[in-house]
């Protein structure tokens, strides 16, 4: 494959994933295939978002790192000193992606570090590693293009997370606003009683203690359930099982109590 064909392969991957959840493993595999190297896609905090192994590295520490999908904190921080592509770093370089405790086995091993940048901020790092043979200009062009594509996908994922969080908060706010004063008071007492995201409660006991009717509690729970904020299930004499579905709800309730 020439450079153009390899670039088209990255484009095909991007087009195929349009509108789907981000698959960083697939991205790593594609880059690994066309560059012929091990590929590690790291987040800002060193989380291994995607990995593709083309050349096996027999080392227990590395295996554990891959299983836990987390690079060491110190190493991750050191990557932020690299602001542009650094190619063909040998085993003696602090940024090598090979186990330094086995230097003798990796005398010809080379690492290339490519910062992943998007929206004016550092989003992560693309690391390429080969047991031998240098990364040439074509490899670096593909790596930088790949890092740009990964950066776009990370930004898109972050944008979707922000939108989802905003939707969750809006749903909670609408659900709370739909409650009457006595229903809101009942809900506050219910979740004081639960002391967590889920649990059992006996509505009649809460009604007697707080001085409200049982129907107020039932109506309040029904409104929250219809909004998708909680789920509830009657367990007969045992009471009612309640589980919070929207993780923004308890925080919103706590903020109301503080006012």
Swiss-Prot record:
Positions of modified residues (Phosphoserine): 215
Record keyword rRNA-binding present: no
Entry GO CC: cytoplasm
GO biological process, one term: negative regulation of DNA-templated transcription
Taxonomy, superkingdom: Bacteria
Pfam families: CodY, HTH_CodY
UniProt family annotation: Belongs to the CodY family.
Known role: DNA-binding global transcriptional regulator which is involved in the adaptive response to starvation and acts by directly or indirectly controlling the expression of numerous genes in response to nutrient availability. During rapid exponential growth, CodY is highly active and represses genes whose products allow adaptation to nutrient depletion.
Protein name in UniProt: Global transcriptional regulator CodY
